[in-house]
């Protein structure tokens, strides 16, 4: 059985790492290069770096920060936020990223996933899905489930999250980064129903994201949600737990991890 991965996430805006609740109320967590180096030393399996306001601000890729982070990190680095084109993938890989994450651009032009995967390989194409559970009123009209949001969680696309994940995997995404907007920053645990629904529907790895408050939540994402990797931010950024503690805890619950 393949080892399950623990992936600290750096949400970056204005050149600083931040963490919010339900995608708002952002709080400063520090310098991205310093934080990335710390996680590298702690034994993180990978790092995810998301420029969370690039798309909504219409900004270009912050390549100088990515180059600085990549120089400190010797584990796979995924970069997302403002990734729009196949050319952007090339620029990020040249800057030191190992994988690139598409979100809003894939919604605007799904063909970009097909093209980027064909050119650079599925292994370096991640599709990030920000999903929110339908309201009770919506569920009465359309059935229970989750909608996909774009532009940093600001815009409901009306697309079903599970169906979108399936389409993205078929188009060549090598991985799905699945965030529950309802759980983001709440520390109440992953939306395991959402995680399981997507994990069961696609054959590519699913990274669970949004809501980790303790180490059992990480293990639950794998054992109950079916995730191949678990992503967390605040529990690591503010020193509540180290990556090594998280790995030991997952191992104690019978989950294969790289210790």
Curated annotation (Swiss-Prot):
Q: Which organism is it from?
A: Polaromonas naphthalenivorans (strain CJ2)
Record-linked CDD domains: HisF (cd04731)
Source organism, top-level taxon = Bacteria
The principal localisation class reads cytoplasm
Record function comment: IGPS catalyzes the conversion of PRFAR and glutamine to IGP, AICAR and glutamate. The HisF subunit catalyzes the cyclization activity that produces IGP and AICAR from PRFAR using the ammonia provided by the HisH subunit.
Which GO BP terms, alphabetically?
A: L-histidine biosynthetic process
Q: Where in the cell is it found?
A: Cytoplasm
**Assembly state and interactors?**
Heterodimer of HisH and HisF.
Catalytic activity line of the entry: 5-[(5-phospho-1-deoxy-D-ribulos-1-ylimino)methylamino]-1-(5-phospho-beta-D-ribosyl)imidazole-4-carboxamide + L-glutamine = D-erythro-1-(imidazol-4-yl)glycerol 3-phosphate + 5-amino-1-(5-phospho-beta-D-ribosyl)imidazole-4-carboxamide + L-glutamate + H(+)
| The entry's keywords | Amino-acid biosynthesis, Cytoplasm, Histidine biosynthesis, Lyase
Gene3D superfamilies per record: Aldolase class I
* Protein name from the UniProt record: Imidazole glycerol phosphate synthase subunit HisF
Pfam families, per database record: His_biosynth (PF00977)
Q: Name one GO cellular component term.
A: cytoplasm
Instruction: Tell me its EC number(s), please.
Output: 4.3.2.10
Q: Does the keyword Amino-acid biosynthesis apply?
A: yes
The record, for PANTHER family, names: IMIDAZOLE GLYCEROL PHOSPHATE SYNTHASE HISHF, IMIDAZOLE GLYCEROL PHOSPHATE SYNTHASE SUBUNIT HISF/H IGP SYNTHASE SUBUNIT HISF/H
Pathway membership, UniProt: Amino-acid biosynthesis; L-histidine biosynthesis; L-histidine from 5-phospho-alpha-D-ribose 1-diphosphate: step 5/9
Cite the active-site annotation.
Answer: 11, 130
Q: Which InterPro entries match?
A: Aldolase_TIM, His_biosynth, HisF, IGPS_HisA/HisF, RibuloseP-bd_barrel
* Family membership: Belongs to the HisA/HisF family.
According to the UniProt entry, its GO molecular function terms are: imidazoleglycerol-phosphate synthase activity; lyase activity
């Amino acid at each position: 059985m393949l080892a399950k991965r623990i992936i600290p996430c750096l949400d970056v805006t204005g050149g600083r790492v931040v963490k919010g609740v339900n995608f708002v109320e952002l709080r400063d967590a520090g310098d991205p290069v310093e934080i990335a180096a710390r996680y590298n030393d702690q034994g993180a399996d990978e790092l995810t770096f998301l420029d969370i306001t690039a798309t909504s601000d219409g900004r270009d890729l912050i390549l100088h920060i990515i180059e600085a982070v990549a120089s400190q990190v010797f584990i796979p680095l995924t970069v997302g936020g403002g990734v729009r084109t196949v050319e952007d993938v090339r620029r990020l890989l040249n800057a030191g990223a190992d994988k690139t994450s598409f979100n809003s651009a894939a919604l605007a032009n799904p063909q970009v996933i097909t093209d980027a995967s064909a050119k650079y390989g599925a292994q370096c194409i991640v599709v990030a899905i920000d999903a929110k559970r339908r309201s009770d009123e919506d569920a009465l009209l359309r059935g229970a489930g989750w909608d996909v949001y774009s532009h940093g969680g600001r815009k409901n696309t009306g697309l079903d999250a599970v169906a979108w994940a399936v389409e993205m995997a078929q188009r060549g995404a090598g991985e799905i980064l699945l965030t529950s907007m309802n759980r983001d920053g709440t520390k109440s645990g992953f939306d395991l129903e959402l995680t399981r629904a997507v994990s069961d529907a696609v054959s590519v790895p699913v990274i669970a994201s949004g809501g980790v408050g303790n180490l059992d939540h990480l293990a639950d994402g794998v054992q109950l949600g079916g995730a191949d990797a678990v992503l967390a931010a605040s529990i690591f950024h503010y020193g509540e737990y180290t990556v090594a503690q998280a790995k030991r805890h997952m191992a104690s619950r019978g989950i294969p991890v790289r210790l």
